Amino acid sequence: MQSVNELCEKGNSLLEVGMYQEALSCFKHALEITPETYDYEDERVWILVAIGDTLFQLQQYSNAMEYLRRAYFYDPGNPFINLRLGQCELESDCILDAKEHLLKAYMAEGSTIFEGENLKYLQAIKRLIRH
């Protein structure tokens, strides 16, 4: 039986070669075997974010939001969680929620958090700020 760390490492390796469904399977299995106790909260948040991010890459925004919202519950100040959650909300036409989360990410990291992301997200937050 693989450990949580082994499953997460395997998931990351699969992501690097574009095998998103396989990576998702690894991350979900890791989440299943991670205890739901305070001692494992950081690990659970990391895995929830990995699942949400993978689903985002697969353009499964609604499913991604489910996992990212769970991660957000534990770590609402995390800029990356706010970024991904806001992106998914924007893609799902949840504009007010998207504005809140993208703005939190932007306020924490500035425009650098949007580097490597589709330019439409930075443009969206700038547009949303003006309105």
Sequence positions of predicted segments:
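Alpha-helical linker/edge segments of TPR/alpha-solenoid repeat scaffolds
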Residues: A50-Q60, E91-H101, Q123-H131
